[in-house]
A protein has these predicted regions:
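Beta1/beta-strand and adjacent pyrophosphate-binding region of the FAD-binding site
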Residues: 2-13
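N-terminal Rossmann-fold NAD(P) dinucleotide-binding loop
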Residues: 16-17
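Conserved N-terminal glycine-rich FAD pyrophosphate-binding loop of Rossmann-like flavoproteins
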Residues: 36-59
Length: 406
């Protein structure tokens, strides 16, 4: 006999794990399915964020890799630093975060299926038949569910049976090295979130150094607005940039590579994704929750999960299908911010020269305090920064009148 669930969640990332956590907490019978055999596999998120999500999602200390105090933006020429005596944010341990969310789901009465990849869905009048394949044995297993959640990230594997059915996508790609360095080098960066802009350190994107537990650093590079046919070339470029940051910025050849991981983001401009169709609800990167400017995804993936759970819970309790409101509410809250970030992303990563990036960062460093910068980078609260932008254009005009480029 086929085992039945109220909800099957496909994908054990932050969005999928949070969905399972919330629905099991509400008393629903949930299966969380993850294609990898361990949450330490495919550990592809840099996971830097502010402190607020720890409280927002009630996350424990054990998922924190490191607290950070300072923000450094290194351009091709100069570095611009904002400092604090207190912690401003965290770098999460992505594997431990996913494990925690799954464990909480189990504690709430849910089930977790590891090492099984999604194969197909078959829509029925009273639910959905879902097929999974064991990654080791290739054996098929089938379940039935009232609702199916697509938390497969940018591949959107559950919502769309055919890639041609997906909306237009913008692609981004990144790679990250998890390295063990000397105590001396680690101590230089243990409190800093470092971003790199400009062609010396990045190409159509940005690079980064994030601290983790003692002597461990995350070093990576990402590129946006790429073509699918250029994926292999992009992977080689981001790999070279990452190794350049290690060699020329950290100035070390004496390090141990603990892990190398990467991934491809597929983002729908103006959030044109399908949020619900035929008993399938999409969450997280499957509805473009990753921010197009900074690439931050965890917080917004989990927020989308919380919002989706409100409508899933209502459907399971009353039978009412209000999922159009799920899409409408999410876009109402985030669309304008995301569109501003889309425009900013193209300007910063593609249009601006090194000199233009340098001039703008120097101006912001001189005029914006730490909280203003964090509000723009992590919360996309642009009001004060927009005032700075008007000031930028005044400065730009003065540069033009003097025959210089700003």
């Amino acid at each position: 006999m086929i085992e039945s669930f109220d909800v099957i969640v496909v994908g054990g990332g932050p969005a999928g794990g949070q969905t399972a956590r919330q629905l099991t907490k509400a008393g629903h019978k949930v299966l969380l399915a993850e294609r990898y055999s361990s949450f330490e596999d495919n550990n592809f998120s840099s996971a830097g964020m502010t402190l607020e999500p720890l409280t927002e999602f009630n996350l424990p200390e054990k998922v924190v890799g490191r607290y950070w105090k300072n923000l450094v933006i290194q351009c091709s020429k100069d570095a611009y630093t904002w400092t604090s005596n207190e912690a401003k944010g965290v770098v999460l341990d992505f594997g431990r975060l996913r494990q925690f969310l799954a464990d909480e789901s189990v504690e709430n009465g849910g089930k977790v299926l590891m090492g099984h990849r999604y194969a197909k869905k078959t829509l029925q009048d009273d639910g959905v038949l879902v097929d999974f394949i064991d990654s080791k044995t290739s054996k098929n297993i089938q379940f039935k569910t009232k609702l199916l959640v697509d938390a497969t990230g940018p591949v959107r594997k559950v919502m769309y049976d055919n890639k041609d059915d997906q909306p237009m996508m913008v692609l981004g790609s990144g790679i990250e090295y998890l390295i063990k360095v000397s105590q001396e080098i680690y101590d230089q960066y243990k409190d800093d979130l470092v971003f790199f802009l400009g062609h010396k350190w990045a190409l159509k994107g940005y690079s980064w150094i994030f601290p983790m537990e003692n002597r461990i650093l995350k070093v990576g590079a990402g590129k946006v607005h790429i073509e699918a046919k250029d994926q292999d070339k992009t992977n080689k470029t981001t790999k070279k940039l990452t190794e350049k940051v290690i060699k020329d910025y950290l100035k070390t050849d004496d390090y141990e590579i603990i892990d190398v991981h990467g991934g491809t983001l597929r983002y729908s401009p103006s959030i044109r994704d399908t949020f619900y169709k035929d008993r399938v609800v999409a969450v997280g990167d499957a509805v473009s929750t990753v921010n197009p400017l900074g690439g931050e995804g965890i917080r917004y993936a989990m927020q989308s999960a919380n919002l989706a759970c409100e409508y899933i819970d209502d459907f399971l309790k009353t039978g009412k299908n209000n999922f159009k409101s799920y899409r409408k509410k999410w876009r109402s809250k985030n669309l304008l911010k995301w569109q501003i970030c889309e425009v900013s992303s193209k300007r910063v990563y593609i249009k601006y020269t090194d000199e233009q990036i340098e001039n703008r960062m120097r101006f912001y460093h001189q005029t914006a305090d730490f909280d203003e910068i964090l509000n723009a980078l992590f919360y996309f609260r642009f009001r004060k920064i927009l005032l700075r932008i008007f000031q930028v254009y005044k400065v730009k005009l003065s540069y033009m009148l003097s025959g210089k480029k700003f």
